[in-house]
């Protein structure tokens, strides 16, 4: 079993007591993690899109998929059918393994890291934040990267409020910044 899942099961009762939840089934839990890269800068270069897809697949441990434009938008020089991004959705064991690597290995490698911002919650207990580069993950070698790009990570929880989502992620080891940003 994943180390982070064991940690969650150990702190579930404590989290339930802290939030004043009577039914243990209402205790917030991680549902999925979505990693996405908007690759508008690489629309015309299929090799670069493939490289981004391979990098995200390596980071996530699961095959990433290319996002295709549904409509043409002249202002962005996007045509219907063009690749505009890459994403992967993690659930279950792979989700817990990725979260563990993110919190314990990747985020501490960010230059001048002072914690992830607290204002990334959406009002329903889900958390979004961005990373500036993919090289903070130990799985990615510098030689295999064609272009440095960032990514957006969405952590979807079963929490019904931001307070419950924050409590869950904080107890699971997410390094939030100290300020009230």
From Swiss-Prot:
Q: Does the keyword Ribonucleoprotein apply?
A: yes
Q: What Gene3D superfamilies does the entry give?
A: 3.30.1440.10
The alphabetized UniProt keywords are: Ribonucleoprotein, Ribosomal protein, RNA-binding, rRNA-binding, tRNA-binding
Q: Name one GO biological process term.
A: translation
Pfam families listed in its UniProt record: Ribosomal_L5 (PF00281), Ribosomal_L5_C (PF00673)
Q: Which GO terms describe its cellular component?
A: ribonucleoprotein complex; ribosome
Q: Which GO terms describe its molecular function?
A: rRNA binding; structural constituent of ribosome; tRNA binding
Does the keyword section mention RNA-binding?
Answer: yes
Family (UniProt): Belongs to the universal ribosomal protein uL5 family.
Subunit note: Part of the 50S ribosomal subunit; part of the 5S rRNA/L5/L18/L25 subcomplex. Contacts the 5S rRNA and the P site tRNA. Forms a bridge to the 30S subunit in the 70S ribosome.
Sum up the protein's function in the record's words.
Answer: This is one of the proteins that bind and probably mediate the attachment of the 5S RNA into the large ribosomal subunit, where it forms part of the central protuberance. In the 70S ribosome it contacts protein S13 of the 30S subunit (bridge B1b), connecting the 2 subunits; this bridge is implicated in subunit movement. Contacts the P site tRNA; the 5S rRNA and some of its associated proteins might help stabilize positioning of ribosome-bound tRNAs.
Q: Would you tell me the protein name for this molecule?
A: Large ribosomal subunit protein uL5
Instruction: Give the source species.
Output: Sulfurimonas denitrificans (strain ATCC 33889 / DSM 1251)
